[in-house]
Amino acid sequence: MSTTNNSRLDVIDALRGFAIVSIMLLHNIEHFDFIFTPSGLPGWLQAIDKVIWDSLFFLFGGKSYAIFALLFGMTFYIQYHNREVRGEDFRARFAWRLVLLLGFGMLNSMFYHGDILSIYAVLGFALIPVARLSSRWVLAIAIVLLLQPYAWIEFIHALPNPDQKLGDPASWAYFGIANDYFANGSAAKVWWGNLTNGKIGVIRWSWENGRLFQIPALFMLGMLAGRKGVFKEGNIIFWRKTLVTAALVFIPFYALKTWPEAWGIGPAVQRPLLTIVTSWSNVAFMVVLVSTFYLLFYSRAWLAIFSPLGRMSLTSYVVQSIVGTSIYYGFGLGMYKYTGASFALAIGIVLAVIQRQFSVWWLAHHSQGPLETVWHRLTWIGGGSMTHAKN
C-alpha cells in the first residue's frame, strides 16, 4: 500500500501509526513505567515539565491504547470478512493468531511490564463468539461492557458505608517492588521481574481501572466500524456528527473526573464512580481523536507520514520497549535520573522519527514488518496459499 494513496486501508494504517507514536511519547515521559522526577531541576524547567506531562496525558493517556483496541477489532473484521467471502470461517485461525500474539506479548512483557499485546491476546477471544451476531446484539454487549458493571457492583456494595477508609489499590505494591529493580537490577533481574511481579501488577491495575471490560468493548466497536464501512472515504458527515457528539459527552465527564472532591461523597463510593467516569471520559475523547484524524486525513496529505509505522505497528511497539527500557532503566543508560518530561519527550520524538524512517526503508524492500511477517506466516501455517489479507 502506498502511504500517499488515501485509500480506506491507508487511513487505518495512518491512525494506527499515530497511536504508536503517541504511545511512544507517553512511555518516554513515564520512563517506561519508572516514574521518577530528577532532583535539582530549575523551577522554570519543572514548570515546563508539568505542562508537557499534563498535556500529553490529557491528549493521549487512556486514549492511544483505546485507538489501538478499536483498530484491533477493525482488523479482525477485515480478516474475517476476507475469508467469509471465500466461504471460509476465520474464527479458528483467529484463535491461533491470538495464541501467537500472546507469545509476542510475553516477549514484549519481558522488556516492558506494561505490555498491552498479551492482554489483547487474551481478551481478543471475546470477538469469536460475537463474530456472527447481529450488529444490534454486538452493540448491546459492547455498551454493557463500557458501562463498567463490576465498578457498579462495587459502588452498590459500598453504599451502606460510603465513608469507609480504603487502602491503596493492590497494584501499587507490585509497582513499588518494580521500581527497585528498575533502578538497581541487572537486565536479567528486570526481565524476570517484569514477567512475574510486573505482569501481576499490570493485570491488577487493568482490573482496578476497568480496562478488562473496556478493551473487549472497543474490540467489538471496531468490528462494527468495519461492518458499517465508516472508515471509507466519503463519510465526512458521519464523522463530523460523531466528533460533535463525542466532544459534548467528553466535557462533563472530564469535569467530573478532574474534580472528584466536588462530588461530596465518601471514598468508598467515590473510587468505583471515578473508575466509571474516567473510563467514559477516555472513550469519548478517543472518539474525538479518531474523528478529528479521519476528517483531517482526507484533506491533509501529510498525515500519511504515520502510515509506515502503522503497517509495522507490532514491530514498532516491541522495538520501542526494548530500546526505551535500555535508555531509562538502571541496567542501561539510567536516564531516568536525569530526564524530566521535557527531555524525555525530546528523546521520544527522536526515537519516533528513527522508527518511522526505518519503517519506510524496510517497507521499500518488504511487504510487511519483520514481526508482522513472522506473525502472518505462523498464522497461516498449514493453511495453503499465503496470499491472505495483511492488514
Over which residues does each language-model region extend?
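Long hydrophobic alpha-helical segments that form multi-pass transmembrane helix bundles
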Residues: 143-221
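Functional transmembrane helices that form membrane-embedded active or gating regions
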Residues: 7-15, 19-20, 242-246, 297-323, ...
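Alpha-helical transmembrane segments of multi-pass integral membrane proteins
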Residues: 220, 265-364
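Juxtamembrane membrane-water interface segments that cap and precede transmembrane helices
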Residues: 44-58, 187-203, 265-272
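Specific transmembrane alpha-helix
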Residues: 66-81, 118-129, 210-234, 281-301
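Solvent-exposed interhelical
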Residues: 88-89, 126-144, 224-245
